[in-house]
Design a protein with these regions (language model features):
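N-terminal basic, amphipathic alpha-helical segments
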Residues: 1-52, 76
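Conserved core of the PLP fold type I
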Residues: 51-183
Length: 183
């Protein structure tokens, strides 16, 4: 049986992460530990033309109608997609964010208060740790495997010992493990 990694911990990761990300800017360093391709590989001229063409056709009201909780038609389509997979969710229950990290931050802000304990998969993507640090949360690491996902035994042990307010998981294409959590 696997066990939670140590006890809960207050985080101090942002400075270290920013040092690593800053090193990516040094052209003498090959960033093997990050997913940033060489900037010279980007077709910037072509991307610029595509963006300019898209901007010419942009509905001026989109800057207002697409504000949170999101574009109404997109929310309807997402609700239909959930329904096709067996989950009945109304469009009013869906909030569209500009990315996974904004969604994670909103969820953690809604569910926790500074000093609360959350469980995270280990290893995990650093930005989730930064969000936890910024919100003043403590974390307990739960071992995860790319084939089997989070150790349910370790999670149960942690839940029996501590009051866990939220559980942070990356269920599909986990970073850094690359796995998809089984059903």
């Amino acid at each position: 049986m696997t066990h939670p990694v140590g006890g809960s911990t207050a985080l101090e990761v942002s400075d270290f992460i920013f040092q690593i990300l800053d090193s990516v800017r040094d052209p003498a360093i090959v960033p093997l530990g990050s997913s940033f391709p060489d900037a010279r590989l980007y077709p910037l001229d072509k991307l610029g033309r595509f963006l300019a063409a898209a901007a010419r056709h942009l509905d001026p009201l989109a800057t207002v109608t697409d504000l949170p909780p999101g574009n109404d038609e997109l929310r309807r389509q997402l609700a239909l997609r959930y329904l096709a997979h067996g989950a009945s969710v109304s469009p009013q229950e869906i909030v569209v964010t500009s990315g996974a990290l904004e969604g994670l931050n909103l969820c953690l802000q809604a569910l926790t208060r500074p000093g609360d304990l959350i469980a995270i998969e280990s290893p995990t993507f650093y930005a989730g740790l930064q969000a936890s640090e910024r919100l003043g949360l403590k974390v307990i690491e739960i071992p995860s495997d790319p084939s089997t996902g989070m150790s349910l035994e370790a999670l149960q042990l942690a839940a029996n010992q501590w009051s866990i307010k939220a559980l942070v998981l990356t269920t599909r294409l986990s970073n850094p493990l690359g796995g998809t959590m089984p059903e």
